Design a protein with these regions (language model features):
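N-terminal Rossmann-like NAD(P) cofactor-binding subdomain of oxidoreductases
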Residues: 1-192, 228, 292-293, 297-302, ...
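Charged docking surfaces used in two-component/phosphorelay signaling
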Residues: 70, 159-340
């Protein structure tokens, strides 16, 4: 008899939490019961899931009693407060915030890249940053085959990565611009409509933004600390899906066609690479889909053993919600739903 589990979604009414609910609804996970948790103001909200009505409860320590797996997207503060309490109550936590990503005690996992890191988990598993996830899904097969030496990444990140208020700000500014009205900027320090901002998260003393350092440090933890890497992260006026320009230098020589064949054969990746017929990954096409789309694969002629690649994925799905559910699937498959 297949063991059934009680799942909790924390931050169930947010952008990512909504995606989590939707992905769980169509998943093959053996879910016996679903607990929906959110801030106190949202407690009592009714939500339909698999044809039944569920009532959202307040996120607190006692809410995790009887829960086997909690997937959390409620922010760093809530994660730091609630995750240890959930583990004390026998619940495995998959956390989408920054709270535990760089802790050596907690695995930082992308199932297509380093699922084996789950084996020795201590009750809390961290979900990586959205921009890191799609990049490493694309880099993993190249690294396994040709050994990556260096990566230069520039991102073009959708406003939904900043939350629903940012999506609404883009919509409102676009409407105001079309009607000749003054644009109001509240979520971002500058107008985002018809603009690009080389500014995601706070700036650090080294001149990098926190988002840029997340990509660098998470790559070292997940894929290989020997890879040299630099990043520039940019917010663009797109609602959903992050795009990335990747420049990759490898130790071993390669043929471009072999890289394309490798991409086609790799889990979680869809190759869209026929530029002569205007076929390449687009943010608007990736929205609502699970794959990491790659294309524009071509040799970098400026140095030996280097290539360029364009990579696009839905930041709310593979960049957040889907990856957490895939981690849960790995835990169930490997019989790792347990706490110390």
């Amino acid at each position: 008899m297949i063991k059934q589990y009680t799942f909790a979604v924390v931050g169930a009414l947010g952008n990512v939490g909504t995606e989590m609910r939707g992905i769980l609804e169509t998943s093959d996970l053996p879910i016996e019961n679903l607990v929906l948790l959110d801030i106190a103001q949202n407690a009592g909200t009714k939500v339909k899931w698999r044809g039944e009505e569920y009532t959202v409860a307040e996120s607190n320590s006692d809410a995790f009693s009887g829960v086997d797996i909690a997937i959390m997207s409620a922010g760093e503060g809530a994660s730091l407060e609630l995750s240890p309490e959930a583990v004390k109550r026998g619940c495995v936590v998959i956390d989408n915030s920054t709270a535990f990503r760089m802790s050596q005690e907690h695995p930082l996992v992308i199932p297509e890249v380093n699922a084996d890191a789950l084996e020795n988990h201590q009750g809390i598993i961290a979900n990586p940053n959205c921009s890191t996830i799609q990049m490493l899904v694309a880099l993993k097969p190249i690294h396994d085959t040709y050994k990556i030496k260096r990566v230069i990444v520039s991102t073009y990140q959708a406003v939904s990565g900043s939350g629903q208020a940012a999506v609404e700000e883009l919509q409102n500014q676009t409407h105001a611009f079309a009607n000749g009205k003054q644009l109001q900027a509240e979520v971002y320090p500058h107008q985002i409509a018809f603009n690009v901002l080389p500014h995601i998260d706070v700036f650090l003393e080294n001149g990098y933004s926190k988002e840029e350092m997340k990509m660098i440090l998470e790559t070292a933890k997940i894929l290989d600390p020997k890879i040299k890497m630099t990043a520039t992260t940019v917010r663009v006026p797109v609602a959903t899906s992050h795009s990335e320009s990747l420049n990759i230098e490898t130790e071993k020589a390669f043929e471009v066609e072999d890289i394309k064949t490798l991409m086609e054969a790799s889990p979680g990746i869809e190759l869209e690479d026929d530029p002569e017929n205007n076929v390449y990954p687009l943010a608007i096409n990736a929205a609502g889909k699970n794959a990491v789309f790659v294309g524009r694969i071509r040799r970098d002629f400026s140095t030996d053993n280097a290539l360029n690649m364009w990579c696009v994925s839905d930041n709310l799905r593979k960049g957040a919600a889907l990856n957490t559910v895939q981690i849960a699937e790995e835990l169930v498959k490997r019989n790792l739903v347990r706490v110390p």
